[in-house]
Swiss-Prot record:
This is Inosine-5'-monophosphate dehydrogenase. One of its GO terms (molecular function) is IMP dehydrogenase activity. It is an enzyme of class 1 (oxidoreductase). Its cofactor is K(+). IMP binds at residues 338, 373-375, 396-397, 421-425, 463.
Length: 536
């Protein structure tokens, strides 16, 4: 006991023991926070996580988290299947950064399948389906193949097929400055080849490739027939992108794509699976329908090795129906996206934080991972979505401004560089005719009308808007910034992994606090003028 004038203080060394005298810990546990009878429906801005004890560096935090029952990502970030967000470029770079991109379906089945192939061919361990040409293939045709697939270095076999005798390789250097486009590649190809024999493991093959200083290493059988390849560029990518999301067997990038629940989507899915698809997302604003349940059961029967993510859902009742049908993951959110007006127009939906907690806590009992889809405007929202039980978060508007998104870049009236972005429920998206080949029946094939059950409507009711978002630079800088911010947030909470975060939220170790309107104002910037740089 210490005395200071008229004040008597406790011994400072007893602080931890005195703390135990308090009946309640600071803040709220997750159940008190999410009690809708007391709090109502909550959004991400309505609460904060309270800090814990930091006993480790942020670099020690791991972000591994499942997106489906069978597939785990090293970065829990997913790009949305919107036609101004995710095509093959976005899907490739999201996968390279440890996340995954979901390719939209507001295009023809063949176009979507081509995008899947580009993702799967981008980075390989053993390339089991290389692009093979014959001696008679022209230089012009080889250049066209390079333009189409985005890579060069084509093996030449007698028949032009895998399994045929290898006779040479055409590299970029062989055709780069060749002006005679009709010349057969037999006149320019490399015939002095370094190869490896079938049965070699990936580590040994990579060593041979590194020592050979060649760009490609063909793998042949005892008869000299081509069976597979490995690429030097993939070795480089492995060094630059150690977190890349890859399949365990082929070492190809993981690729996801969305489809609808119409009968013709079964044919679309068959083409996507043939192209190498790993995950299919059933794209609907309201997933608890007879159409989606029937589609889930059909997919699990026809393609048992394909992971299926159902949704969207915001209640336990919706989730239960899809879990019972056999989904491998769920997508949570209705009306919370930045370009979505479903809650306003339809008066149906749910505040995102409340939806994520209620659905994910129920789905966790069945081992079904959940994606928090919508309402993500910053790193803090990502943290909150994961703290409420989601395994990953899906982003649309936050990624639409990146270089890799397919949206059009332009200068706004204010002189700022922006990119076009639209909700799939917007009139612009629902009237897009690419999916139907531009025909008069294109509305029936449109991804937007399918998502919002409007294929046969004579009057389209918008559930989204069109606009623009600020240009954010490359995914290769923006996603690492999001991941670094997430690690520092978990460090502040005293959590070393997302699994630990989920466990400590459930057992009450991680605490929360409701934010009043004044508290939200206090937590923002309060300056006359300022410049907000997100990362450097």
């Amino acid at each position: 006991m210490a005395v200071n004038g008229n004040n008597t203080f406790l011994d400072h060394t007893s602080a931890m023991e005195v703390l135990k005298e308090y009946e309640r810990r600071d803040g709220l546990d997750i159940r008190d926070l999410m009690d809708s009878k007391l709090q109502g429906g909550l959004t991400y801005n309505d609460f904060l996580l309270l800090p814990g004890y930091i006993g480790f560096p942020a670099s020690a935090v791991t972000l591994d988290s499942p997106i489906t029952k069978r597939i785990t990502l090293k970065t829990p970030l997913v790009s949305s299947p919107m036609d101004t967000v995710t095509e093959h470029e976005m899907a490739i770079h999201m996968a390279l950064q440890g996340g995954v991109g979901v390719i939209h379906h507001n295009c023809s089945p063949d176009e979507q399948a081509d995008m899947v192939r580009k993702v799967k061919r981008y980075e390989n361990g053993f390339i089991l389906d290389p692009v093979v040409i014959t001696r008679d293939t022209t230089v012009g045709e080889a250049k066209a193949l390079k333009e189409k697939w985005g890579f060069g270095g084509f093996p030449v076999t007698e028949s032009g097929n895998l399994g045929s005798k290898l006779v040479g390789i055409v590299t970029n250097r062989d055709i780069q400055f060749e002006t005679d486009l009709d010349k057969p590649v037999s006149e320019v190809m490399v015939t002095d080849l370094i190869t490896a024999t079938a049965g070699v493991n990936l580590l040994e093959a990579n060593k041979i490739l590194a020592e050979s200083k060649k760009g490609k290493l063909p793998i042949i059988d005892k008869e000299g027939n081509l069976v597979s390849m490995i690429s030097r560029s993939d070795l480089t990518k492995n060094l630059h992108f150690p977190l890349a999301s890859k399949t365990k067997d082929s070492k190809q990038l993981i690729c996801a794509a969305a489809i609808g629940t119409r009968p013709e989507d079964k044919d679309r899915l068959a083409k996507l699976v043939d192209a190498g698809l790993d995950i299919v997302i059933l794209d609907s604003s309201q997933g608890n329908s007879m159409y989606q349940i029937e589609m889930i059961k059909w997919i699990k029967k026809e393609f048992p090795d394909l992971d299926v993510i159902g949704g969207n859902v915001v209640t336990r009742e919706q989730a239960a129906a899809l879990i019972a049908a056999g989904v491998d993951g769920l997508r949570i959110g209705m009306g919370s996206g930045s370009a979505c007006i479903t809650q306003e127009v339809m008066a149906v939906g749910r505040p995102q934080a409340t939806a994520v907690y209620n659905v994910s806590s129920f789905a966790a009992r069945f081992g079904v991972p959940c994606i928090a889809d919508g309402g993500i405007q910053n790193v803090g929202h990502i943290v909150k979505g994961l703290a409420l039980g989601a395994s990953t978060v899906m982003m649309g508007g936050l990624l639409a401004g990146t270089t890799e998104s397919p949206g059009t870049s332009f200068v706004s009236r204010e002189g700022k560089l922006v990119k076009a972005y639209r909700g799939m429920g917007s009139i612009d998206a629902m009237q897009d005719k690419k999916a139907g080949g531009g025909g008069k029946d294109a509305q029936k094939s449109n991804a937007g009308t399918a998502r919002y059950f409007s294929e046969g409507d004579s009057i389209l009711v918008a559930q989204g808007v069109s606009g623009a978002v600020a240009h954010r630079g490359s995914i290769n800088k923006f996603v690492p910034y999001l991941a670094a911010g997430l690690k520092h947030s978990l460090q502040d909470c005293g959590m070393t992994s997302l699994q630990e975060l989920h466990e400590c939220v459930e057992n009450g170790t991680v605490r929360f606090e409701i934010r009043t309107a004044s508290a939200q104002l206090e937590g923002g910037v309060n300056m006359e003028s300022y410049e907000k740089k997100l990362y450097a």
